[in-house]
Amino acid sequence: MGELEKEERIKSALEKQFGGAVSNASVQRRNRVWAEVETAKLPEVMAWLKAEGFNHLATVSGFDEGENLGAYYHTTDFKTVVNIKAKTPRANPVLPSVLSVFPGALSYERELVDMFGIKVQGLPPGRRYPLPDDFPTDQYPLRKDWKFVPPANETEAD
């Protein structure tokens, strides 16, 4: 098998299976595949990857690209990592949940809500994570434009 044959096969299969819903697919190095998916197709793509043996969701990484927010979903077969990017407009940031495919995504998706202000459709109600329940709900610490605003009864030096 060629050095990147497995990775190229995964990339091609993703493109073939999902057509125009997958873009910017690439193999940048051994054991790594990257692709961007249309937001609405995220759960379907993740279900397909799981069925193909990528049945461990290693983590989810949120991002802020200015006009867009989103997340990378990193799934693995314990050798190769497939990194799926889904983005959403900053003005109305919404991503579909992948909990029906990967129940372990719960804390990762709650983190997208707390830290980036992304609404995750299908996320069940529950406690905030990782921020405390009394943290202001209109502040998103991992957005590039976030500025800490201390509560009225506190200062930054406290």
Region locations from a protein language model:
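Terminal low-complexity/charged segments
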Residues: 1-158
